[in-house]
UniProtKB/Swiss-Prot annotation:
<comment type="similarity">
    <text>Belongs to the short-chain dehydrogenases/reductases (SDR) family.</text>
</comment>
<dbReference type="InterPro" id="IPR050259">
    <property type="entry name" value="SDR"/>
</dbReference>
<feature type="active site" description="Proton acceptor">
    <location>
        <position position="158"/>
    </location>
</feature>
<dbReference type="Pfam" id="PF13561">
    <property type="entry name" value="adh_short_C2"/>
</dbReference>
<feature type="binding site">
    <location>
        <position position="145"/>
    </location>
    <ligand>
        <name>substrate</name>
    </ligand>
</feature>
<dbReference type="InterPro" id="IPR002347">
    <property type="entry name" value="SDR_fam"/>
</dbReference>
<dbReference type="InterPro" id="IPR036291">
    <property type="entry name" value="NAD(P)-bd_dom_sf"/>
</dbReference>
<keyword id="KW-0560">Oxidoreductase</keyword>
<keyword id="KW-0520">NAD</keyword>
<comment type="subunit">
    <text>Homotetramer.</text>
</comment>
<dbReference type="GO" id="GO:0047935">
    <property type="term" value="F:glucose 1-dehydrogenase (NADP+) activity"/>
</dbReference>
<protein>
    <recommendedName>
        <fullName>Glucose 1-dehydrogenase 3</fullName>
        <ecNumber>1.1.1.47</ecNumber>
    </recommendedName>
</protein>
<feature type="binding site">
    <location>
        <begin position="11"/>
        <end position="35"/>
    </location>
    <ligand>
        <name>NAD(+)</name>
    </ligand>
</feature>
<dbReference type="GO" id="GO:0032787">
    <property type="term" value="P:monocarboxylic acid metabolic process"/>
</dbReference>
<dbReference type="InterPro" id="IPR020904">
    <property type="entry name" value="Sc_DH/Rdtase_CS"/>
</dbReference>
<dbReference type="GO" id="GO:0047934">
    <property type="term" value="F:glucose 1-dehydrogenase (NAD+) activity"/>
</dbReference>
<dbReference type="GO" id="GO:0006629">
    <property type="term" value="P:lipid metabolic process"/>
</dbReference>
Length: 261
């Protein structure tokens, strides 16, 4: 646990499910004030809010589409209005849908790029704007993927969004380091999240993925949440412009480098 995270105001996009929910609960355990953004499932968001509060934190929920500029502006401003400030912005909302590249529609391409990359840019921009205007040494954490560095069949749009995020994060980190604002990525590998539930329910597919992970198992959302808490804490005060991979060593596995699909 990180005592300096108590009462910090943390905004998490896509915070009602999967990795976002795990991070929300972890910051609740740290007694932070958590702003849970959700897209359309209010019941799920309310459940996440309750879980954060039961863990020891405070929480509010804010509906919004991260691809819409006005929604992201509202999200950040609501956090500031409700809790008085902003300390940590976690751009976690993301989508993926494997499609053969020659069959990928422009609408599908745009949906993934707009959600994963543009959404993260908007969240980063609004948070950094507030940090700069108020002389706050704030923290931005973007949820990337092992695919920011590893190509993968059927994921051209997703890999492009994460590769773009890598350069965006590094550029922002360099630009705002003199102001004490830190910007980092987390790069999860294969995770036990709702988006992967159907795939990993198949023993054959699960075993195939596990065979590419040196540590031998599919990651838990709580393991990514632990990385987020570290990066948000003062223990990571000299860390900026990196991607911290939580992948069980997957990016180092030789066959993974070939883009097995």
């Amino acid at each position: 646990m990180y005592t300096d995270l108590k009462d910090k105001v943390v905004v998490i996009t896509g915070g009602s499910t999967g990795l976002g929910r795990a991070m929300a609960v972890r910051f609740g355990q740290e007694e932070a004030k958590v702003v849970i953004n959700y897209y359309n499932n209010e019941e799920e968001a309310l459940d996440a809010k309750k879980e954060v509060e039961e863990a020891g934190g405070q929480a509010i929920i804010v509906q919004g589409d991260v691809t819409k500029e006005e929604d992201v502006v509202n999200l950040v401003q609501t956090a500031i209005k409700e809790f008085g400030t902003l300390d940590v912005m976690i751009n976690n909302a993301g989508v993926e849908n494997p499609v053969p590249s020659h069959e990928l529609s422009l609408d599908n391409w745009n949906k993934v790029i707009d959600t994963n990359l543009t959404g993260a840019f908007l969240g980063s921009r609004e948070a950094i704007k507030y940090f700069v205007e108020n002389d706050i040494k704030g923290n931005v954490i973007n949820m990337s993927s092992v695919h920011e560095m590893i190509p993968w069949p059927l994921f051209v749009h997703y890999a492009a969004s994460k590769g773009g995020m890598k350069q965006m994060t590094e550029t922002l980190a360099l630009e705002y380091a003199p102001k004490g604002i830190r910007v980092n990525n987390i790069g999860p590998g294969a995770m036990n999240t709702p988006i992967n539930a159907e795939k990993f329910a198949d023993p054959v597919q699960r075993a195939d993925v596990e065979s590419m992970i040196p540590m031998g198992y599919i990651g838990k959302p709580e393991e990514v949440a632990a990385v987020a808490a570290f990066l948000a804490s003062s223990q990571a005060s000299y860390v900026t412009g990196i991607t911290l991979f939580a992948d069980g060593g997957m990016t180092k596995y030789p066959s993974f480098q070939t883009g097995r699909g």
